[in-house]
Amino acid sequence: MFQQIAYNPKILSGKPYIRGTRLSVEFVLELFASGATRDEVLKTYPQLTTESVEEALKYAAQSVKNDVLLDVKVKS
């Protein structure tokens, strides 16, 4: 299902990562959360491809579909 995402307990403490790199899916998500654009991410990390970034986002979306979600309180 996910050709670009790999998992190995001996790499990055078992976090899912982009195959052929040592960049975790979590790290890629944090880049976007901090405001980076896709073009900025691809320019800064040339080992990533458009396909690998898209797959990381899809992997994350699939992961939270089946996860327990925590309550988030919003301050007004």
Short names for language-model regions:
Residues 2-17:
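Short, Lys/Arg-enriched N-terminal segment that forms or immediately precedes the first helix
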Residues 3, 73-76:
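Short hydrophobic/aromatic patches at helix-to-coil boundaries
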Residues 24-54:
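Amphipathic, hydrophobic secondary-structure cores in small proteins
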Residues 50-74:
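C-terminal structural segments of small proteins and small subunits
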